[in-house]
Amino acid sequence: MSSSVSSKTRYWVLALAAIVLDQWSKWAVLSSFQYRERVNVIPSFFDLTLVYNPGAAFSFLADQGGWQKYFFLVLAVAVSAYLVRAILRDEFAALGKIGAAMIIGGASGNVIDRLIHGHVVDFLLFYWQNWFYPAFNIADSFICVGAVLAVLDNIVHRKDSKKT
């Protein structure tokens, strides 16, 4: 195995870890909660719950007729394929590759939900008084943190390329 391939193994392990952690956490919630049941963890701030999201992040397009399930499925697969290719071609520095792997893992976790359940399982609910942040899951967290890392990588490399 070439050193280039073996050096990328850590990114595939990270993506796989994101998928496993996401699916395990969803299995635990699905096994323990009834739909819309809430258990307070931190008073007036954080609950565990079980809700279904047929749309995208923050229930975007959730009230549509069902076409969005396939749209987001295809979108997640296409973005993941692009990111896999980018990692393999060394189009990112290390921080960008970590971010890409996190996005791939998170997107894959939500794709698995769409294929198995027809919707994404969300269970983390943060709120303050009467303001509620939309429920989300571990996969969403990996996607968001991964996106931030990819953007930071892009900013750093833009500055580096201007120096040369």
Swiss-Prot record:
Q: A Gene Ontology MF term for this entry?
A: aspartic-type endopeptidase activity
Which compartments does it reside in? Cell inner membrane
Which cellular components does GO assign to this protein? plasma membrane
- One short Pfam name that applies is Peptidase_A8
Which InterPro entries does the entry mention?
Peptidase_A8
Residues crossing the lipid bilayer are 11-31, 41-61, 64-84, 92-112, 132-152
Instruction: Report how it sits in the membrane.
Output: Multi-pass membrane protein
E.C. number, please? 3.4.23.36
Q: Which reaction does it catalyse?
A: Release of signal peptides from bacterial membrane prolipoproteins. Hydrolyzes -Xaa-Yaa-Zaa-|-(S,diacylglyceryl)Cys-, in which Xaa is hydrophobic (preferably Leu), and Yaa (Ala or Ser) and Zaa (Gly or Ala) have small, neutral side chains
The chain's coiled-coil residues are: none
What residues sit in the active site? D122, D140
**Keywords of this entry:** Aspartyl protease, Cell inner membrane, Cell membrane, Hydrolase, Membrane, Protease, Transmembrane, Transmembrane helix
Could you tell me which pathway this protein works in? Protein modification; lipoprotein biosynthesis (signal peptide cleavage)
Tell me the protein family, please.
Belongs to the peptidase A8 family.
* UniProt cross-references to NCBIfam families, sorted A to Z: lspA
Q: What does this protein do?
A: This protein specifically catalyzes the removal of signal peptides from prolipoproteins.
- The molecule here is called Lipoprotein signal peptidase
UniProt lineage: Bacteria, Pseudomonadati, Pseudomonadota, Betaproteobacteria, Neisseriales
Gene that this sequence comes from:
lspA
